[in-house]
Regions:
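Extreme N-terminal segment that seeds HTH/winged-HTH DNA-binding domains in transcriptional regulators
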Residues: 1-63, 74-75
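Minor-groove-contacting beta-hairpin "wing" of winged helix-turn-helix DNA-binding domains
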Residues: 68-74
């Protein structure tokens, strides 16, 4: 859960959480939960999730297919 009482922005907390989960293998190559599901799970707004997903894309951890969702990329 993202903590709103910390000085670190919620989107950065979410990036850190999702990065740890991806690197730990919690999410294998394949689809991530929907934006709506991530909002509910982490108690954040849509814009926060979208910003976090953009940073994960920029880092090469995920890719997004229009109208399909975001996916964990294959890690070689």
């Amino acid at each position: 859960m993202v903590r709103h009482d910390l000085p670190e922005p919620a989107y950065q907390q979410l990036v850190a959480i999702l990065t740890r989960q991806i690197e730990a293998g919690q999410w294998h190559t394949g689809p991530l939960p929907s934006v709506k599901a991530l909002q509910a799970e982490y108690g954040v707004g849509r814009d926060t999730v979208l910003r976090a997903l953009q940073l994960l894309r920029d880092a090469g951890l995920i890719f997004t297919v229009a109208k399909r969702g975001s996916y964990v990329g294959r890690r070689d």
